[in-house]
């Protein structure tokens, strides 16, 4: 939109500005360390006073992370970021940094499921730069894929945490530091209500790094049973390629996102309207569910 000095001033006046972090995040998910720093993706990294940078990893104007993972990802021996399951886990690692670093965010449709059709996909599924505006496949069937649903659940957990009313002020504060020039990247949130450390190895080989923590003591992994003992303000960690952790300074019980069971509930009355009625060839069905889940509608004449 403008140079950084002008955007900083506009942010001080209250304007929200786009923060395009597509290239850097994608370099990291593909396993390359060149141009893979996240520092400039967040307001503190730009020297802003206000957390008014709307950070995004994907958009209507940028290539899909998963598409480039599969097409161009880095490899080392048997480890390949071009593998679907591996690439999805790396997108999950990137999403942890994107979601849990303070400031507003934008996510693009189906990114939470690892959408892997190019932004230039044509209606015949070929890829051509002239097809930027072509209709893209709608992939609700991704939800049936265990690895894709795992990415979806991770997004849900990250957003559930940052939307917790107890921590709202921490996720709009400037009390964080992003260290992301190396292959092991980290984010430290030194909030008043919660303190977090996100760390991950974006290399395609094991890596060891000394990671700073906001305070000494026991830090609890939020999405596994691990914990990290910290002495002297930092800890040496060795991570496998694509391995990441979200540590908190207290043991927070997180609710696991699970699928709603498919079940028939004939006794449940669901408001339904069908227009027009009577109908000829097509109709619009409006309904309201009491809980989210898969729905099957059968119409009989």
Predicted segments with their positions:
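Active-site-proximal helices and loops of the catalytic beta/alpha 8
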Residues: 1-62, 71, 87-105, 111-194, ...
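Short, small/polar residue-rich loop motifs at catalytic or cofactor-binding pockets
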Residues: 49, 292-294
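Short, basic, glycine/proline-bearing loop/turn elements
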Residues: 68-84
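Non-cytosolic beta-sheet module surface loops
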Residues: 200-202, 211-213, 276, 286-291
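Beta-strand signatures of extracellular beta-sandwich domains
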Residues: 218-220, 296-300
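C-terminal beta-strand-rich structural cap/linker in extracellular carbohydrate-active enzymes
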Residues: 231-257
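Surface-exposed, proline-anchored Ser/Thr-rich loop/turn motifs
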Residues: 261-289, 299-300
């Amino acid at each position: 939109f403008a140079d950084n000095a002008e955007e900083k001033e506009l942010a001080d006046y209250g304007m929200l500005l786009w923060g395009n972090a597509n290239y850097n995040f994608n370099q990291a998910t593909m396993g390359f360390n060149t141009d893979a720093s996240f520092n400039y993706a967040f307001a503190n990294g730009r020297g802003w006073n206000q957390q008014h940078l709307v950070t995004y990893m994907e958009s209507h104007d940028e290539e899909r992370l998963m598409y480039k993972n599969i097409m161009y990802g880095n490899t080392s021996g048997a480890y390949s970021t071009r593998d679907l399951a591996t690439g999805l886990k790396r997108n999950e690692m990137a999403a942890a940094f994107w979601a849990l670093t303070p400031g507003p965010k934008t996510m693009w449709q189906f990114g939470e499921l690892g959408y892997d059709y190019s932004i230039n996909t044509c209606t015949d599924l070929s890829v051509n730069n002239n097809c930027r505006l072509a209709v893209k496949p709608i992939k609700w069937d991704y939800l049936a894929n265990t690895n894709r649903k795992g990415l979806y659940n991770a997004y849900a957990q990250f957003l559930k945490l940052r939307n917790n009313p107890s921590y709202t002020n921490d996720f709009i504060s400037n009390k964080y530091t992003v260290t992301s020039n190396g292959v092991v990247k980290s984010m430290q949130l030194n909030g008043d209500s919660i303190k977090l450390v996100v760390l991950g190895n974006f290399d395609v080989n094991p890596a060891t790094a000394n990671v700073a923590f906001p305070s000494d003591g026991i830090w609890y992994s939020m999405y596994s049973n691990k914990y990290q003992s910290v002495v002297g303000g930092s800890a040496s960690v060795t991570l496998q390629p694509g391995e990441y952790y979200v540590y908190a300074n207290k043991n927070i019980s997180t609710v696991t996102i699970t699928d709603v069971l498919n079940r028939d509930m004939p006794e449940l009355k669901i408001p339904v309207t069908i227009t027009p009625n009577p109908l000829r060839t097509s109709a619009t069905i409006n309904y309201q569910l009491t809980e989210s889940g898969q729905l099957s509608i059968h119409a009989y004449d």
